Structure formats: C-alpha cells, structure tokens
C-alpha cells in the first residue's frame, strides 16, 4: 500500500516507521524545520534524487531524503507556514497523487496543514485521516466553521486515549465509530493502522 503522511508532529515519524515495517511505501510530507529534529536522531538522512515525480519538481521548493525506509519530502518553511502560499502546496499534493496514487492521506498538526490536507483529500476523493491533538483543539474557538467542516469530511479521526476520544466527541460532529483510539506507543501500531486504512479504502467508492 502506498501512503502519504503529512505534518510536523513528533508522532508522524513513529507512525511512518511502523507503516514501513509493515511493508508499505510511505511518503512523509513535512517542512524543512522537521529536518532539525531528525538530524538530531540516530538514524541517518540520505539525500534522495529518485522519489519525486517530475511534475512536482518546480511547484514548491522541496528537499527529498531517504530516512528509515521513509521517502521524506521537506517543503520550504515559507510555503509551509503561510496560508497565502498553500494554493501551491495544494497543487503539489494533487500532482503528486496523480503521479503516485496513495490509498490514504493521513495528517497531523499544524491546523492550516491539517485543513489543507483534508480539503485536498476531499477534492481528490481519497480517504483522509486526521490525528487530533491539543494543538488542533484551539481551532474550535478560532475557526469554528472550518473545524466543523473538517470533522464532517474526515474518514477517521485518531486520538491516543479513551479520555481524548470522549473529549473530541464533545467538541466535533463525529461519531464514536469515526474516532479511533490508537496509542502511538503500542507494539502493533503498524498492524492497527494497516487494518484501519484497508477498511477506509474498501469503503471509498
């Protein structure tokens, strides 16, 4: 299964590594700021010249690497942070999906990137998964309309504990079936995610 995980959260690496261990082809779209964190880790970063589709090479400035079996795509920090430039990032993800179709788009914080990912997945008719965090909860107050819209578009939402599940169900128009409790430290993380993605893919027309 080819998958795309999108975000700067520290949990993204853990999820991506677990999915690679299951034999999946995992692309991780992040900002160049993520490189600082990864450079401090034990695993090496190797520059990759063979993972980016030709159609994506000039849409946004991007650096590509191999990292723990993950195909890492780091977008220029300015394009990542500024919503005014997110139309280019939208185009990038659309072209990427056309060249290398992914079964699922799974996104994390920050909120503008999470919203962009869900919007793009909706446009592409690809299942979208959102891992909720306390960072995202502030959007409920700041952008309540977009918060509710995102909740109605996601195929599944992931939280780390039953307590967080209960909290999210009070904050967003989601059903208990949509909100999955997945502890990112569990030993069978890759298998759990694979089962979820497979189910979502089967439910997509």
Regions found by a protein language model. Give the residues of each.
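N-terminal subdomain of nucleotide-sugar transferases
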Residues: 1-56, 187-194, 198
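Histidine-centered beta-alpha loop that forms part of the nucleotide-sugar donor binding/catalytic region
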Residues: 7-8, 110, 132-136, 183-184
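Alpha-helix capping/helix-boundary segments
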Residues: 34, 112-113, 163-165
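A short, charged, and often flexible helix/loop element on the N-terminal side
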Residues: 47-92, 107
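A short, histidine- and acid-enriched strand-loop-helix "catalytic/donor-clamping" loop
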Residues: 80, 126-143, 156
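A short beta-strand/loop micro-motif in the catalytic core of glycosyltransferases
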Residues: 154-162
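Helix-loop-beta element that forms the nucleotide-linked donor phosphate-binding surface
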Residues: 165-185
